[in-house]
Amino acid sequence: IHDKRIDWTRINAFHMDEYIGIHPEAPQSFGHFLRIRIFDKVPFKKVNYLNGLAENLEEECQRYADLLTKHPVDIVCLGIGENGHIAFNDPDVADFNDPKLVKVVELDPICRQQQVNEKCFMTLDLVPKEALTLTIPALLKAEWMFCIVPFKNKAQAVYQTVYGEVSEKCPASILRRKENSSLYLDPESAERINL
């Protein structure tokens, strides 16, 4: 963030996923999470947020898709969920050939429970059941993908990403087919990987 060689005023930033029904200033909002850690710390040209409170969610998906088309993504920084999701592309809704760039998805129970386990929500009942997400093809349009995956609870998903079948059953497995894709692990998340 503090690298003086980067002219942040030339960069349009996007976030990849957002809960439906969560206020943008709520601590659980991914837009809020990114804003306080990154977006407020450097002078981006523009920061674009998904609106999980939009009255018409299909229009919101189209608005965001139009922005992504107007400002093609160069770099995606992402993680992997316990179920192998990238953004909110859980196994049941992931589609490697999705015709959409942004869509409404139903979150699977493993994804929702992860949010409780990580103390984002106190109980499963408080975790939204739906979210907005960039689709897998939208993510793969980026020139570069940097996937950062810490913590032991992600070790199985990392194993499936690296060694399992490339399929929507582990959405992150598609990263193996993406040129210019890098996976960064800590010792705990990498415990099942032969290095």
Where are the model-predicted features located?
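Solvent-exposed alpha-helices and their adjacent loops that cap or buttress functional pockets
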Residues: R5-D7, K41, L67-H71, D95, ...
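ATP/nucleoside-binding phosphotransfer catalytic cores, i.e., glycine-rich phosphate-binding loops
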Residues: L134-P137, K141-L195
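A short secondary-structure junction signal
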Residues: E59-Q62, A87-D92, N97-D98, A157-T161
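Glycine-rich phosphate-binding loop
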Residues: H71-F96
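A glycine- and small-aliphatic-rich helix-loop capping segment at beta-alpha/alpha-beta transitions
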Residues: I1-D7, F30-R35, P91-L101, V166
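Short, flexible loop segments at the rims of nucleotide/cofactor-binding pockets, characterized by
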Residues: L53-N56, M122-P128, T161-V162
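Class I SAM-dependent methyltransferase SAM-binding "motif I" and its flanking Rossmann-like core
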Residues: A87-L134
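Ligand-binding beta-strand-loop-alpha-helix segment within the catalytic cores
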Residues: I6-C77
